[in-house]
Amino acid sequence: MEKSNTDALLENNRLYAGGQATHRPGHPGMQPIQPSRRVAVVACMDARLDVEDLLGLQTGEAHIIRNAGGVINEDAIRCLIISHHLLNTHEIILVHHTRCGMLAFTDDLLRAGLEGDAAAEKLIGQATGRAFVSAGKASASPAAFQAFRGPPEPLDAPRSDASTERIAADVRRGLSIILNHPWLPTAGPDAITVRGFIYDVDTGRLEEVSYPGPMGGFG
């Protein structure tokens, strides 16, 4: 069986975690618009994730879609549909990570803090270790912050079984959304494949998340 591009990138990650990064920085010259590996990656915006480095991707090989948490929301789906149908990607890689900031709050808590609730401001400040400055007013946008479901924990708390399962549950939730979207085919000649991972920020290693399994939601 021919190795998938995702499997090849996992081998790059093994080398990266061992101190042998395969990403080559620098402008490579003219490139085609379609990603040469036919891969799209959805990942968290966390500064500790250098997606190109940890997957050994070169310029022009993949689409990189990033947001807070690496969550599969409407905009991520919009990007994936365009990536697949117009730019010929067929493998989707979803990357969450340990010590994620999306574990440190709930949607209701952050919204209350932004609107000026003193108790919420204090709790967020305790979680983040910095003074939280409220906007002091309400806003309908964004409609949700999409924090991972569960009790808030201190920002950048050490990895635990509970936090790992919360992250894995959101990976599975994202996989389910992608696999069940009517415009992202999983069968036939134009089928996509989707796999989800947790990146350990302490070791540099990607760990695959089993699917199906327990799924999370937004806090």
Curated annotation (Swiss-Prot):
Q: Which domain of life is it from?
A: Bacteria
Description of how activity is regulated: Weakly inhibited by thiocyanate (SCN(-)).
Cofactor(s) needed: Zn(2+)
Disulfide links within the chain: none
Alphabetized Pfam families for the sequence:
Pro_CA
Q: Where does Zn(2+) bind?
A: C44, H97, C100
Q: What class of enzyme is it?
A: hydrolase
Q: What is its EC number?
A: 3.13.1.7
Cofactor: how bound: Binds 1 zinc ion per subunit.
Q: Name one GO molecular function term.
A: hydrolase activity
Q: Does the keyword Zinc-finger apply?
A: no
Q: Show the catalytic activity.
A: carbonyl sulfide + H2O = hydrogen sulfide + CO2 + H(+)
Q: Which UniProt keywords are listed? A: Hydrolase, Metal-binding, Zinc
What function does this protein fulfil? Catalyzes the degradation of carbonyl sulfide (COS) to hydrogen sulfide and CO(2). May function as one of the microbial sinks for ambient COS, which is an atmospheric trace gas leading to sulfate aerosol formation, thereby participating in the global radiation balance and ozone chemistry. Shows little CO(2) hydration activity and poor carbon disulfide (CS(2)) hydrolysis activity.
> How does this chain assemble?
Homotetramer. Two pairs of subunits form tightly associated dimers.
Family per record: Belongs to the beta-class carbonic anhydrase family.
Name of the protein in question: Carbonyl sulfide hydrolase
Organism expressing this protein natively: Thiobacillus thioparus
Top-level taxonomy: Bacteria, Pseudomonadati, Pseudomonadota, Betaproteobacteria, Nitrosomonadales
